[in-house]
Amino acid sequence: MKAYQRKLDIRNGCVDLSHGSGGRAMAQLISGLFHEAFGNEWLARGNDQSAFDVRAGRMVMTTDGYVVSPLFFPGGNIGSLAVHGTVNDIAMAGAKPLYLSASFIIEEGFRFADLKLIAESMGAAAREADVHIITGDTKVVERGKADGLFISTAGVGVVPDGLDLSAEKARVGDRVLISGTLGDHGVAIMSKRQNLAFETEIVSDSASLHDLVARMVQAGGRGIRLMRDPTRGGLAATLNEIAQQSNLGFHLLEEAIPVKPGVAAACELLGLDPLHVANEGKLVAIVAPEAAGAVLAAMRAHPLGRDAADIGEAVADDHHFVQMATSFGGGRIVDWLSGEQLPRIC
């Protein structure tokens, strides 16, 4: 039987419907592009699934979809974002990420060159996070039926013994820690989407937080009540969600919340509130007061936590409000975002 040609015309070629048909062209795409980008022992077996060994203990699993527009943005692209976002969802349980799956829905006519860049960035992000993309799927839809490329992922990880992070564990007096500046990702996406040029380029904060989380857990142990990554809806949505789940409220100090000057200026120009803008490389931790100092020091000692800050505390509040003392000496309620401020941000 004649072997199929594995070589794709990466420079000039485009995806067509045959690349999702299950035939020779699809085999070329998988072997010549995805396997080269993600290559590992599991994918090399060519099965429709991947088997892996697990040790006794608690596992976590997550799933996510990525429809960001534009596909390429300052600081990353949909591929690196898909890995970072999935790894971070696992890491917020204090877990070590292990394995990912990735499914691609590709629009007919999508350039191989762009797909290769995206796949390579996924592979690089996975290697950096010490995770493996061990199974996946590819579908191709007609022109006009998708906006270039959508990615769906799933991931699994293992939780360290004795660690159980949950909003139910939050208590009055717990400190609210943020790992760095807010709004970088959302403003980077919006500036690229609207072709806005600022004096200082605003770059997405998209990054995998697993190593930062491991350092925090080592420093704070069971003093860490829970962690969340403030993605869509930003810090405001995250803290409102935690307030509802924990039956508490939060008091924040605006002056303590880190926002880069360029991001603050861009938000003012665009009519955005940094507290509502998405982040893809930050986390919020609710930490017992006796552990907060050690956890904050561990965060600041890590490259992804240099701008970490203690921004407030958990309080008793039957209404579960998130309130903030403003820099002008007043106060305001930080509510959920109403409507859609930044669509297709991740």
Curated annotation (Swiss-Prot):
Keywords: Lyase. Pathway: Protein modification; [NiFe] hydrogenase maturation. It catalyses: C-terminal S-carboxamide-L-cysteinyl-[HypE protein] + ATP = C-terminal S-cyanate-L-cysteinyl-[HypE protein] + ADP + phosphate + H(+). The keyword Cell division does not apply. The modification S-carbamoylcysteine is found at residue 346. It comes from the Bacteria. The keyword Electron transport does not apply. GO terms for molecular function: lyase activity. Its EC number is 4.2.1.-. It is an enzyme of class 4 (lyase). Modified by HypF, which adds a carboxamido group to the thiolate of the C-terminal cysteine, yielding a protein-S-carboxamide. The carboxamido group is then dehydrated by HypE itself to yield a protein-thiocyanate. The modification S-cyanocysteine is found at residue 346. GO terms for biological process: protein maturation. Pfam families: AIRS (PF00586), AIRS_C (PF02769). Belongs to the HypE family. PANTHER family: CARBAMOYL DEHYDRATASE HYPE, HYDROGENASE ISOENZYMES FORMATION PROTEIN HYPE. Involved in the maturation of [NiFe] hydrogenases. Along with HypF, it catalyzes the synthesis of the CN ligands of the active site iron of [NiFe]-hydrogenases. HypE catalyzes the ATP-dependent dehydration of the carboxamido group attached to its C-terminal cysteine to a cyano group. This is Carbamoyl dehydratase HypE. It comes from Bradyrhizobium diazoefficiens (strain JCM 10833 / BCRC 13528 / IAM 13628 / NBRC 14792 / USDA 110). The lineage of its organism: Bacteria, Pseudomonadati, Pseudomonadota, Alphaproteobacteria, Hyphomicrobiales.
